[in-house]
């Protein structure tokens, strides 16, 4: 099990919501934020909205073990090889969450206009009850969760520099989450969501 002493920040109880937060988990967050901003080969993907291609409102990069392709929003991401920095952060988050990770989606929110809409990390390659470890670096942003059937009030968390949030169990099946836009002047935020790809394609493979 995860180290309960790490996850001391209470999350409002809600049905089938298995979320825990470790405030200030990453003591050397400043160093890693600065490094990721300059080392990461950021790209801005596109999605189709009402038949039109539009850029997503954030920058991103996908890293992972060989064969860990990831499909979301109609896009297929091929993994970049682990860097020394990301492998270290992966191992630290895996130890805290007491689970293994083989991939990470790195998102860069440049201003308060960058965001991600309501969604669940429920793609088939993540399995039925995925564990997602979300590491926040940089500006504090508001993270919201809501039940898909709207049977419970939304849960709102302000995620700060160095915080680690872990979602597990039925959370992805029954809840959605988002990072909303804000009109407040905020600095840059980098978020790393570590996950495990079930049955990744072998090296050089695809489908």
PLM segments and residue spans:
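Non-heme Fe(II) oxygenase metal-center motifs and adjacent flexible, charged/small-residue loops
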Residues: 1-207
């Amino acid at each position: 099990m995860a180290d309960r002493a790490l996850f001391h920040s209470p999350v409002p109880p809600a049905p089938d919501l298995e979320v825990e937060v470790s405030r200030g988990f990453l003591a050397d967050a400043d160093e890693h934020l600065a490094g990721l901003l300059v080392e990461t080969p950021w790209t801005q993907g596109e999605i189709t909205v009402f038949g039109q291609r539009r850029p997503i409102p954030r920058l991103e990069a996908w890293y992972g073990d060989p064969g860990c392709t990831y499909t979301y929003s109609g896009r297929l991401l091929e993994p970049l090889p682990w860097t020394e920095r990301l492998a270290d952060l992966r191992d630290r988050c895996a130890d805290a969450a007491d689970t293994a990770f083989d991939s990470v989606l790195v998102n860069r929110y440049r201003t308060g206009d960058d965001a991600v809409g309501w969604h669940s990390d429920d793609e088939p390659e993540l399995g039925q009850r995925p564990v997602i470890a979300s590491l926040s670096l940089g500006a504090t942003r508001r993270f919201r969760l809501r039940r898909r059937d709207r049977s419970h009030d939304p849960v709102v968390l302000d995620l700060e520099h160095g915080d680690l949030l872990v979602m597990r169990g039925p959370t992805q099946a029954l809840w959605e989450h988002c990072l909303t836009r804000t009109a407040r002047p905020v600095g840059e935020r980098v978020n790393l969501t570590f996950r495990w790809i079930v049955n990744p394609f072998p090296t050089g493979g695809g489908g």
